[in-house]
Amino acid sequence: LDVQRRITRHIEHLKSREAIRVNRAAMLKRIGSYSQKKSGTSQFVAKQYQGIVKALNTDSTGNWYRPVVSTFHTKTGRDHTLGSSLNQVPKQYWKSVLSPPKGSVYALLDYQQQEPMIAAYFAQCQVLMHWYQKGDIYKNIVQLVGGQFSRDQCKQMLIGRLYGIGYRTLAEKLGIALSRVRALSHELSRLIYPIDHYLARSADVIRHQGFARSLDWKYTISDLDGQLSLTNWKIQATGADIMRRACLRLDDANIPLLLTNHDSFLVRLEQAQFQNQLDAATQALTDAAADVLNGFRLKVAVEMMLPSQEK
């Protein structure tokens, strides 16, 4: 498809998405509970649920939530959900409020380590690409640094490098000494030098041209765009290119896609055809990434699976 047709199909896809069935009583219960807590996260989730409850469409089959998604809201081309949304709620909260229709399973599919591997592919960082094809890049980084850091700490550090997060901020976020953050960053620098070099060069090219371009998207920059946003632009825009192709491939496979959440996809599968449809959905996402990355395949995992409780 050419770009205009693909964007048009994506807009049509968004308009035709199924609504998401939720448990209104469970949401109301959690609004009451979370709003009484001091935790900022709990307060935030309560506010999101309040907005969702107000927008629910209720009929004889249940309570339905339809996200309002903007296609042209971000400079990188990623879809953006307007207003209160499930996207903004941490995914570990979802199971308690989703209510799949009878005979259905809600499944959340997730690209594994998408952003660092997009960067590794473009930079041809052979070490990360090899580790990824063999297993988990973060576990390999743990081994590289002699087990001094946890997998999550190594993940946060690598992602932080891609986003240009400073040492002090990372130290506070990870709860470790600044000197240890610097030491880990030094080890990462030796490992991902091709990525650092590629992203810096990409940002310089964007600045010189005055615009950034991916397969589907073009963004004209201004003096307000900082170097860090330009450095990360190609990764985010490529993720958006993959997302759009995944949406269309799921449509072609007759798999209802209900919601995208960055690099995750909430789909509805039929219990009677569960494994076949799960395989088809996984293949659709794998193929979408390969379409964008010239055959390089991102791995897909099932992050959440929620069958209907109705008999």
Give the ranges of each region predicted by the language model.
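Acidic, glycine-rich two-metal-ion catalytic cores of nucleic acid-processing enzymes
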Residues: L1-V145, H208-S264, L278-L285
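Conserved catalytic core of nucleic-acid polymerases
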Residues: Q143-T260, R297-K311
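Short beta->alpha junction loops/turns
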Residues: Y111-Q112, Y163, A177, E270-Q271
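Short alpha-helix boundary/capping elements
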Residues: Q126, L162-G166, L269
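Helical (often loop-to-helix) elements that flank the catalytic cores of nucleotide-handling enzymes
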Residues: R180-S185, A272-L293
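Catalytic palm subdomain of template-directed nucleic-acid polymerases
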Residues: R168-L170, L174, L266-T282
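Short, solvent-exposed polar/charged micro-motifs at secondary-structure junctions
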Residues: R78, P116-M117, R268-E270, S308-K311
